[in-house]
């Protein structure tokens, strides 16, 4: 559901009125096949899923879709460094192929992108054309920066000090928005960025807890003009730690008994 907590409209018998929700009715759609893919990775080592994914976010921007197709690799015994290497290599490989083999399509899209940019206020326009963005990502090494370092950079940035950010960065633990991610990529580092080691309380239960007890081995790949493009994480392989995280997030262990068994017998 896209309703806010405790604000969902209800019917006369007290049930949620899904006719007023995002999809207009009660709907169960796939968010991710990641947990299930882990079971296959335990047997095969390297697997991936590719298929439709759905979000119930009522976000009307050019960066959010109710439905999109997503690829999700799962690799047994891979740490976060390997995860980041895989994401960077995959992105560069795809973009290099597209730039070489889809020139006419890209020229059409680049022209359309340029026309759309002209309709925006000057401060909101991209500094690069579509083709320049793709080449920018394909040709540059990705900068790897911890979440903590990124927060320090953003907190001391001119847009933050001059209150230009819609969501000011005041303290560690903030969930970064697109404006923050784009600043890091386009203004500060001027190259694609991979942020890693996020606060545990803003990430999923299955991400491996670091020794500091407050961050997890998660990463996001950030693109110019967009922000987050890829997300990933090293999985929590320690059974006792995983159970404690599930309890802290009020996740029913009985519903995910099969997932926990991967830590017992995987």
Language model segments and positions:
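A residue-level signal for conserved active-site and pocket-lining positions in enzyme catalytic cores
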Residues: 29, 73, 150, 195, ...
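Cytochrome P450 heme-iron axial ligand motif
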Residues: 234-238, 242-245, 263-266
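Class II aminoacyl-tRNA synthetase-like tRNA-binding/catalytic domains
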Residues: 1-76
């Amino acid at each position: 559901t896209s309703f806010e907590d405790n604000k969902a409209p209800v019917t006369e018998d007290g049930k949620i009125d899904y006719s007023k929700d995002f999809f207009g009715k009660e709907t169960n759609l796939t968010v991710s096949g990641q947990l299930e893919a882990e079971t296959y990775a335990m047997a095969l080592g390297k697997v991936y899923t590719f298929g439709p994914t759905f979000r119930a976010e009522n976000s009307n921007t050019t960066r959010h879709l109710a439905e999109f197709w997503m690829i999700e690799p799962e690799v047994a015994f891979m740490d976060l460094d390997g995860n980041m290497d895989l994401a960077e290599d995959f992105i560069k490989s795809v973009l290099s192929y597209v730039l070489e083999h889809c020139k006419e399509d890209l020229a059409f899209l680049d022209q359309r992108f340029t026309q759309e940019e002209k309709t925006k206020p000057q401060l909101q326009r991209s500094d690069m054309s579509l083709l320049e963005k793709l080449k920018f990502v394909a040709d540059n090494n990705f900068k790897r920066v911890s979440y903590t370092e990124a927060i320090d950079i953003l907190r001391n940035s001119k847009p933050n000090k001059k209150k230009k950010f819609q969501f000011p960065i005041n303290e560690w633990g903030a969930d970064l928005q697109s404006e923050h991610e784009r600043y890091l990529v386009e203004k500060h580092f001027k190259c694609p960025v991979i942020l890693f080691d996020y606060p545990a309380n803003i990430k999923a239960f299955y991400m491996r807890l670091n020794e500091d007890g407050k961050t997890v081995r998660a990463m996001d790949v950030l693109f110019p003009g967009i922000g987050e493009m890829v997300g990933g994480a090293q999985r929590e392989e320690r059974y006792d730690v995983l159970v404690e995280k599930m309890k802290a997030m009020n996740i029913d262990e009985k519903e995910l008994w099969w997932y926990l068994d991967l830590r017992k017998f995987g």
